[in-house]
């Protein structure tokens, strides 16, 4: 599913990733943990083709993306990878349903099909009755679930999440954490989650520990 080999990355004189080798299989829920500055977010961004490594090879869902041009990468990213961040980044002028549909529009999915897909996912997440509400009418937990639904709309093979529950209270954290496993079981996606949350790391299928740009 995800294969990284010899990944290095530097910013100026600071080497952030120091030869990362990593294999993640289809359907795994994997957490990446480590102290601040360990390189977790940089690794996730490279895994998601949002940034490029200085050296190394990246294979995602059977495709070597290492040599792709930006236009190819953008199309690949929109189809194969979903992203969830700490802050939901929903567009305030659109409803929950419309926010979820945006990546489908970018991918050229017809409006009717995009709407049906979005409503199916929102229904699965218990948000069907909130579909017509705008972000300022939703709770923090609801907004983050809408963001997860948006990440799923194009049926990507992998979901990459960076501190997805970092801004939530304990109850909403637990609900979101369980949601990742429910989604994996329902849709079969692979989840890679950068987190400082020990409770989440403990329940993932595998935990990857990073220190100073290395996996230990």
Swiss-Prot record:
It is a peripheral membrane protein. It comes from the Bacteria. It is found in: Cell inner membrane. Its main location: membrane. Keywords: ATP-binding, Cell inner membrane, Cell membrane, Membrane, Nucleotide-binding, Translocase, Transport. Coiled coil: none annotated. It is an enzyme of class 7 (translocase). Its EC number is 7.6.2.-. Residues 2-216 form the ABC transporter domain. ATP binds at residues 34-41. GO terms for cellular component: plasma membrane. Gene3D superfamilies: P-loop containing nucleotide triphosphate hydrolases. Pfam families: ABC_tran (PF00005). One of its GO terms (molecular function) is ATP hydrolysis activity. Belongs to the ABC transporter superfamily. Lipoprotein translocase (TC 3.A.1.125) family. PANTHER family: ALPHA-D-RIBOSE 1-METHYLPHOSPHONATE 5-TRIPHOSPHATE SYNTHASE SUBUNIT PHNL (PTHR42798:SF7), LIPOPROTEIN-RELEASING SYSTEM ATP-BINDING PROTEIN LOLD (PTHR42798). The complex is composed of two ATP-binding proteins (LolD) and two transmembrane proteins (LolC and LolE). Part of the ABC transporter complex LolCDE involved in the translocation of mature outer membrane-directed lipoproteins, from the inner membrane to the periplasmic chaperone, LolA. Responsible for the formation of the LolA-lipoprotein complex in an ATP-dependent manner. This is Lipoprotein-releasing system ATP-binding protein LolD. It comes from Bacteroides fragilis (strain YCH46). The lineage of its organism: Bacteria, Pseudomonadati, Bacteroidota, Bacteroidia, Bacteroidales.
């Amino acid at each position: 599913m995800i294969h990284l080999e010899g990944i290095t990355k530097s910013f100026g004189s600071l080497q952030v990733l120091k030869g990362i080798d990593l294999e993640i299989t289809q359907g795994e829920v994997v957490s990446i943990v480590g102290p601040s500055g360990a390189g977790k977010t940089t690794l996730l961004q490279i895994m998601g083709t949002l940034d490029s490594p200085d050296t190394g090879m990246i294979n995602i869902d059977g495709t070597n993306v290492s040599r792709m041009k930006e236009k190819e990468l953008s199309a690949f990213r929109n189809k194969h990878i979903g992203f969830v961040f700490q802050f939901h980044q929903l567009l305030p002028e659109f409803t929950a349903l419309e926010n979820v549909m945006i990546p489908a529009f970018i991918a050229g999915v017809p409006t009717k099909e995009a709407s049906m897909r979005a409503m199916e996912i929102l229904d699965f997440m218990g948000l069907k009755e909130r579909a017509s509400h705008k972000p300022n009418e939703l709770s923090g937990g609801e907004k983050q679930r809408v963001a997860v639904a948006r990440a799923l709309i194009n049926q990507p093979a992998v979901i990459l999440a960076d501190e997805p529950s970092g801004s939530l209270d304990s109850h909403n954290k637990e609900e979101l954490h369980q949601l990742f496993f429910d989604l994996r079981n329902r849709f079969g996606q692979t989840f890679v989650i950068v987190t400082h949350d020990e409770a989440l790391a403990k329940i993932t299928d595998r935990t990857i520990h990073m220190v100073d740009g290395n996996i230990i």
